[in-house]
Amino acid sequence: MLKTRLALLLLAACAASATAQEPTWRKDVGPMVAAKCGACHGAKMPEYSDWMQLGDDKRKTVAPRIDSNPTFMTYVVWPGTGAMMRRLDDGKVAGGKPGNMYQYLGGSDEERAKNLQMVKTWLGDGAWNLNRWNARGDVPGVTKEQLEKVQAKY
């Protein structure tokens, strides 16, 4: 009986430890986004639907808002499916060309790689993909299976 209790206690401690190490929006990703992206993508910027109403020229000079979990996820799952991944990608997925926002993930290669890995881990195993909602060119649209891999704990 004592061995069973000890084994259960050890198992619970291991599970709690694994959960504590998983990145969350509140503890990890949100503060990094605020620090690295907030100056251009903060609370004063338009949300996705308002940003999309701007003309093409204006959208080139006004950044969309990504200061919260819901506004961030707009560019992961829908309606801006995959946009976050395409912008932050280090180029190892996109044929050697980093996304246009990758450079802002940190001041050094090491910091950028660390922050990118944190976002990838937070999204979930296999959730990092560059697909849009609809197919474009040779790139197919995102699948239900790909979207189901997004975990992104709050």
Predicted regions and their residues:
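Short non-domain terminal segments
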Residues: 8-9, 23
